[in-house]
Amino acid sequence: TDIIVGFPNETEEQFEETLSLVREVVYDSAFTFIFSPRPGTPAARMKDETPAEVKKARFLRLKELIDEQATYTASKFVGQIVEVLFDTVSKKDKTKISGYERHGRLVHVDGDESLIGQIKKVKITSSRTYSLMGEIIDDWRRSSKSWSN
């Protein structure tokens, strides 16, 4: 979702309507921007009397709300098992690999490049605002079945 604040002459009431909608929807994440005019568009020709500092303050309020919602929704994943398609080795830590679960959440686990392109079951152990940490359980499940025989 993309949300733009500071459209020319946006009122506080209009901005509050945006916040109300965001509270109602509860976004996992959103791309938020301060309006910038694009040449050739009707909005680029509009006179704008909303001060830049008001636009920035609104942007920060919106971002804070979306970050709170993202932190909350991410925390609900802790303890769940999700399927993750792995696609990247961490640039900072070569013992970590990352991928996405089916709803687009970024998931980090211990692993290496051999997992790239694979889908694995992962138990989510902790969360951050825009990502999840977990451990692969596919191999554990296979081996645990052999223990019960």
Language-model-detected regions and their locations in the chain:
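Terminal RNA-binding accessory module
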Residues: 45-149
